[in-house]
Regions:
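Short, solvent-exposed loop/turn segments that connect beta-strands within catalytic domains
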Residues: 24-26, 48-49, 89, 103-105
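Short, low-complexity N-terminal intrinsically disordered segments enriched in polar/charged residues
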Residues: 1-35, 144-150
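Charged/polar, solvent-exposed surface patches and flexible loops
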Residues: 14-17, 34, 63, 67, ...
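A solvent-exposed, acidic/Ser-Thr-rich amphipathic alpha-helical stretch
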Residues: 9, 30-89
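Short, mixed-charge, low-aromatic patches
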Residues: 15-25, 49-54, 69-73, 94-96
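A beta-strand edge to alpha-helix "cap/lid" segment located at domain peripheries
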Residues: 2-7, 67-150
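Short non-domain terminal segments
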Residues: 13-14, 31, 40-42, 110, ...
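Residue-level detector of alpha-helix boundaries and kinks
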Residues: 4, 17, 46-49, 101
Length: 150
């Protein structure tokens, strides 16, 4: 059973699940946030306005994702590809997420590559590459009210 403290993050469940699937056997924790080290560094390499380039610490990551479900709700994640690095601490995962924009009901699809460093079975560094144009386009439609899906 998922810890009730993570209930506000259910909009991200498909992301959490595919991330844990990609890192299975390498990290400990029942929930994605439990796999994150307290002093983790998150880097977002392709960003859009309002999104940070870097976060320091697990609590900062949790705070960033706290309002995610107000804008986007994911209903699936797939296309997982796992790459091993020459550095045994590093895993590269590719995946796609699918969802909808809350304000408009428009579809949201994005692709990611995440370079993840693990130490002592916790994620200590996460470098994220995403299709920021897809995110910007979807969210700008939401802010202008364009493309209401049926």
């Amino acid at each position: 059973m998922t810890d009730p403290k993570y209930a506000p993050f259910t909009a991200l469940d498909p992301f959490f699940e595919i991330s844990q699937q990609g890192l299975a056997g390498l990290v400990d924790g029942d929930h994605y946030f439990d796999t994150i080290a307290d002093d983790v560094v998150f880097e977002f390499r392709y960003i859009f306005p309002g999104w940070p380039q870097r976060l320091n610490g697990r609590e900062a990551l949790i705070a960033l994702y706290a309002g995610y479900g107000n804008s986007i709700v994911l209903h699936g994640a797939d296309a997982l590809v796992i790459h091993r690095s020459q550095d045994p601490r590093v895993v590269i995962i590719e995946y796609e997420v699918h969802g909808k924009i809350v304000a408009t009901g428009a579809s949201y699809d994005n692709r990611f590559i995440s370079v993840v460093t693990i130490e002592d079975r916790k994620i200590v560094h996460w470098r994220d590459y995403m299709d920021s144009l897809a995110a910007m386009t979807a969210l700008s439609r939401a802010s202008t009210g364009a493309e209401k899906s049926e």
